[in-house]
Amino acid sequence: MNKELISEIPLLEDKAVSEIENAASLKDLEKVRLSYLGRKGVVKAYFDDLKNIDDAGEKRDLGAVINVLRNKIDQLITSKENELKDKEVKLKLQNEAVDITLPVRPERIGKIHPLSKVISEVKLIFAHMGFKAVDGPDIEDEFHVFDALNTPSHHPAREEQDTFYLRNKINDKRMVLRTHTSSVQIRTMEKTKTFPIKIVAAGRVYRNDFDATHTPMFHQIEGLYVNENVNMGQLKFTIHCFLSKFFGDKGLRIRFRNSFFPFTEPSAEVDISYKDSKWIEVLGCGMVHPNVFKNVGIDHTKYSGFAFGIGIERLAMLKYQISDLRSFYDNRVSWLNHYGFHFSSLR
């Protein structure tokens, strides 16, 4: 019996090698593996036959021969398995290959909203003039929105028909949705006593109004410059430089009209004649009122300053010829595709 086992092993090895080489798929190879190395396979049967050998030395030697056979078959199967897997991957890649000569489908890319574009551009222009961008809260107390800005309690702007008041008070203070970004200049002057103070603040503001030229929420950018000997001439120069740069017209016609704002004295409204159109108001400005300086603890006899407030929507409507303010917030993709900008234009 032992001699028969030894004589069968080379024949079995040749047969196993042939079947492994001829396996055309991983499924076929698995059948070969089970027939030789499985629990009911030929090699397992050989190991079981060792139990019938009494001589320990003979059993050991024959077991070593069978073990060599098992390891060789296992190595051949592993090698063949890797070969078949590589072949499957190559075949899959070949069948799934992309024809690079086919025309590509156009990729849809989102666009920058005109308001985002204008805010970015305005900030950049003022940054080149030395203004630092700052932020402030949308929900404010009455002091920062009205009282500190020299707006008396009987002023029409403080009535509920014009201003959104919140029901809950904070620290016993009546809260509002800010009606202008001027509240940011108050907060800046309260905490900053090093001069010069030169800031711009862009953000959302809220007023109870809705028509073709007004929305309950819109955007402003506030500017403030405080130092010794600041004068109206510097204000006019700053506004002129900004508007000329923004509209890309060094010869832009600009005029200042006397006006009134509680927080500036003197005050002015600025009009432009853009693309040979009639005069159009674009912003309000003026010299910071002495009472405003008193309310934030700045010596108005030593320091002076100017401030201005610009409607972002108004600038965008003029520059890009948008007729209805409400269209900024309609969320129409067709409108944004027409008036929007490529992301690379946002700086």
Swiss-Prot record:
Tree of life domain: Bacteria
Presence of keyword Ligase: yes
Enzyme Commission number(s) from the entry: 6.1.1.20
InterPro entries in the cross-refs: aa-tRNA-synth_II (IPR006195), aa-tRNA-synth_II/BPL/LPL (IPR045864), Phe-tRNA-synth_IIc_asu (IPR004529), Phe-tRNA_ligase_II_N (IPR004188), Phe_tRNA_ligase_alpha1_bac (IPR022911), Phenylalanyl-tRNA_Synthase (IPR002319), tRNA-bd_arm (IPR010978)
A Pfam family that the UniProt record links to this protein: Phe_tRNA-synt_N
Cofactor: Mg(2+)
Record-linked Gene3D superfamilies: Bira Bifunctional Protein, Domain 2
Enzyme class: ligase
Keyword Aminoacyl-tRNA synthetase: yes
NCBIfam families named among the record's database cross-references: pheS
HAMAP family from the UniProt entry: Phe_tRNA_synth_alpha1
Family stated for the protein in its record: Belongs to the class-II aminoacyl-tRNA synthetase family. Phe-tRNA synthetase alpha subunit type 1 subfamily.
Protein name as catalogued: Phenylalanine--tRNA ligase alpha subunit
Name of the gene: pheS
